[in-house]
Curated annotation (Swiss-Prot):
Chlorophyll a PD2 binds at H196. The D1/D2 heterodimer binds P680, chlorophylls that are the primary electron donor of PSII, and subsequent electron acceptors. It shares a non-heme iron and each subunit binds pheophytin, quinone, additional chlorophylls, carotenoids and lipids. There is also a Cl(-1) ion associated with D1 and D2, which is required for oxygen evolution. The PSII complex binds additional chlorophylls, carotenoids and specific lipids. This is Photosystem II D2 protein. It is an enzyme of class 1 (oxidoreductase). NCBIfam families: psbD. One of its GO terms (cellular component) is plasma membrane-derived thylakoid membrane. Belongs to the reaction center PufL/M/PsbA/D family. GO terms for molecular function: chlorophyll binding; electron transporter, transferring electrons within the cyclic electron transport pathway of photosynthesis activity; iron ion binding; oxygen evolving activity. Keywords: Chlorophyll, Chromophore, Electron transport, Iron, Magnesium, Membrane, Metal-binding, Oxidoreductase, Photosynthesis, Photosystem II, Thylakoid, Transmembrane, Transmembrane helix, Transport. Pheophytin a binds at Q128, N141. Its main location: membrane. A plastoquinone binds at H213, F260. Chlorophyll a ChlzD2 binds at H116.
Length: 351
């Protein structure tokens, strides 16, 4: 008689770590968490530190922290000085040489927040991929989240990489982002860019689709509860439908003459529209990084310059852009010591 004794399979450190990372807990960690949690913590902490204590006097010549009197809307972590170029501004690098105060003065916190923020967003997308795989569903949430990542990377990293330095990226603050939008309009005529138009159509179109879809579902809920509040009649595990797709189809068929008859196609469309808007606007920002122009109607500009009585909304916008450039550049880039002669300042077509 032969007795076979099985040997327990060898478990290496990788298997032990894999089990610990994927353990069922209140906040799932996962392999993506190794990237997500440290980078998100450092990015948020860097932003809170910068907006609370760090001045922008040495980079932009302005106050930008709560300590200097700013509020939540005007505080920001400002971009590094123009002279820093595209340096990563490492704390131990040749610029700061390990001096934390000097590092903050040069704008090192902005580079710190931007890079850690980008990796945190990527980690969050990978987290959605990882959990979708473990749960056994498709990864469309992660694919959709690539839209915000594309916008962040193109605006905060790709655009300044195409310009002379990190200085021209947006600073991390509410009013700072508004200033950046004015800059994009004045120097790139961004609102007339077709990629911006597609981005606006995607974002506002997505909001419209979301509102229409939510209202339609609420309109066609089945009266399947005895309570005054219809929300209490829903159970997450119920097998039957909670609203009538047929009734919704009849409603919109009467309104537009056409309506979605397939829930899968409807929800894919709701995914596609805003994500494509984010992607196309990101492509447009990369075009701005390369200083590509779009929709420059030079013939109208020439005619407006020659004929004081000829003016279009386009030529009026061009004059507004010239004003933005003329008055924004000296204030925004004081280190350049811009001086504009009186004759080049915009005064309107008739003068």
């Amino acid at each position: 008689m032969t007795i076979a004794v099985g040997r327990a399979p060898q478990r290496g450190w990788f298997d032990v770590l894999d089990d610990w990372l994927k353990r069922d807990r209140f906040v799932f960690v996962g392999w993506s968490g190794i990237l997500l949690f440290p980078t998100a913590y450092l990015a948020i902490g860097g932003w809170l530190t910068g907006t609370t204590f760090v001045t922008s006097w040495y980079t932009h010549g302005i106050a930008s922290s709560y300590l200097e009197g700013c509020n939540f809307l005007t505080a920001a972590v400002s971009t590094p000085a123009d002279a820093m170029g595209h340096s990563l501004l490492l704390l131990w690098g040749p610029e700061a040489q390990g001096d934390f105060v000097r590092w903050c003065q040069l704008g090192g916190l902005w580079a710190f927040v931007a890079l850690h923020g980008a990796f945190a967003l990527i980690g969050f997308m990978l987290r959605q991929f990882e959990i979708a795989r473990l749960v056994g569903i498709r990864p469309y949430n992660a694919i959709a989240f690539s839209g915000p990542i594309a916008v962040f990377v193109s605006v905060f990293l790709m655009y300044p990489l195409g310009q002379s330095s990190w200085f021209f990226a947006p600073s991390f603050g509410v009013a700072a982002i508004f200033r950046f939008l004015l800059f994009l309009q004045g120097f790139h005529n961004w609102t007339l860019n077709p990629f911006h138009m597609m981005g606006v159509a995607g974002i506002l179109g997505g909001a419209l689709l979301c509102a229409i879809h939510g209202a339609t579902v609420e309109n066609t809920l089945f009266e399947d509860g005895e309570q005054a509040n219809t929300f209490k009649a829903f159970e997450p595990t119920q097998e039957e439908e909670t609203y009538s797709m047929v009734t919704a189809n009849r409603f919109w068929s009467q309104i537009f003459g056409i309506a979605f008859s397939n829930k899968r196609w409807l929800h894919f469309f709701m995914l596609f529209v805003p994500v494509m808007g984010l992607w196309t606007s990101s492509i447009g920002i990369i075009g701005l990084a390369l200083n590509l122009r779009a929709y420059d109607f030079v013939s109208q500009e020439i005619r407006a310059a020659e004929d004081p009585e000829f003016e279009t909304f386009y030529t009026k916008n061009i004059l507004l852009n010239e004003g933005l450039r003329a008055w924004m550049a000296p204030a925004d880039q004081p280190h350049e010591n811009f001086v504009f002669p009186e004759e080049v300042l915009p005064r309107g077509n008739a003068l």
